[in-house]
Amino acid sequence: MSFLKNNVEGFGSTVVNTGEVSGQGLSGAYAQTIRDGYPLFTFVMPTFLRFDAFGNGVYANGAKDELQGSALPKFNAGLTNNFSYKKFTASFFFNAVTGFVVYNNTANALLLKGSLKNAKNVTRDVVNSIENSINPGNVSTRFLEKGDYIRFANASINYAVDVKQGSFIKGLNISLSGQNLGLFTKYSGLDPEVNVDKSRNGVPSRGFDYTATPRARVFTLGINARF
């Protein structure tokens, strides 16, 4: 279990912006900043409020940029256990990460509900959206989401097979293991544990999801024989 609290210090009045945002009409747009007195990799963007009666976006404070949350988690914990029963042994590991946000650039660039309403086989939330089809997908908290998650990271089970005394095989174990077995999160993208490189002018970024490939779920069957 670990906690993280950090602030950039000694930066003076210097402000470094990073986190290039991809998408139509978003050339040169950014969503992250590094500045004195704030956590590293803090997001900066207007606060989205709602759509108006015409389906256009409404933003707080005249759509001025505001400092939002950080991409660095504040809390990280793990739970592991090993146990055995007769000839079975097993283990599992869960990890939980909270206190950070992710910018869903995939939704910003490709999943604007207003522009998808005239397509075929769309989801219910697209059909029911009041967003105007020409409403621009500006960088805003509309696409900034909590990334908190609990992951069933791995598990394994092993069985020691009985072998006859004096047989050719002295010992035999059969095992089955799995990686990335489950993910519990309210993040709307595929996986909140992403970090697509959206650096700007050589300054690194963190916490951006842009068409990222989710972690694979892997199962492994093993047989260990001793002769």
State what each model feature region is.
Residues 17-44, 119, 135-139, 185-227:
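C-terminal beta-signal and terminal closure region of outer-membrane beta-barrel proteins
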Residues 87-90, 164-165:
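Repeated loop/turn-to-beta-strand initiation elements of outer-membrane beta-barrel proteins
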Residues 75-81, 152-157, 217-221:
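Hydrophobic, lipid-facing positions within transmembrane beta-strands of outer-membrane proteins
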Residues 1-2, 84, 95-97, 177-181, ...:
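Outer-membrane beta-barrel pore domains and translocons
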Residues 40-42, 97-181, 186, 195:
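Extracytoplasmic gating/loop element in the C-terminal half of outer-membrane beta-barrel translocons
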Residues 92, 174-176, 223:
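Membrane-embedded beta-strand positions of outer-membrane beta-barrel proteins
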Residues 1-71, 179-189:
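Conserved small-residue
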Residues 54-63, 129-141, 198-205:
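Flexible, solvent-exposed coil segments and beta strand-coil junctions
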